[in-house]
Amino acid sequence: MSLTYKGAGAPSLSDINFTAKRGQTIGVIGGTGSGKSSLISLIPRFYDATEGSVEIMGRPVRQYPRVDLRGKVAVVMQKAQLFGGTIRSNLLWGSQNASDADLWAALETAQAAEFVKAKPLGLDEPVEQGGRNLSGGQKQRLTIARALVGKPDILILDDSASALDYATDAALRKALAALPGDLTVFIVSQRAASLQHADQIIVLDDGRMVGLGRHAELLESCPVYKEIYESQFKKGDAQK
């Protein structure tokens, strides 16, 4: 599968080929401009592949009605988007039919329940437009919770835990892995430490997939991944 943006002289992605099984956690890592966001944008059809195809459950994504695809795939971007209202009203954008129990379950998984419970009004605590009255980490956790409220088949986290400390990031990944059912999670991250326990890690470099495997395998077989990991380890960023 390849992707060339309209008007671009060269492809942003070339010869990408992988299979993600239901229930797996897939890590995506690479340097700036390597194609990470381009890759995950093909799953919900923000863009369409110019060569090859992306399939969900054996069916090309182009064959899904967009409304059905949006119900199957939830994307959480690095820049959290919150609306003026309350915590509850923001979460209900994930599903208008969600009960309070559903909201709290999503908050627990997203590691947001504790700070919401500490608010005087809990779920009814006011949220300013853009979440101006919340910290970066709180906003990211609420947007992850909102995505979970919709009960998607595929959850894409595009560097959306970047404002979380390592302990909270690790707790989030553990909670996602423990969810019942067959949720497939794509984690795009600059932190190799965030992907160490993924079932598969896709390593991108200049729009090409230069590595695919588990953490230990890639340390042995993929120079690009090894370089990323070791550079972060030396800085104290790559932790178990």
Task: Name these PLM-found stretches.
Residues 1-240:
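ABC-type nucleotide-binding domain
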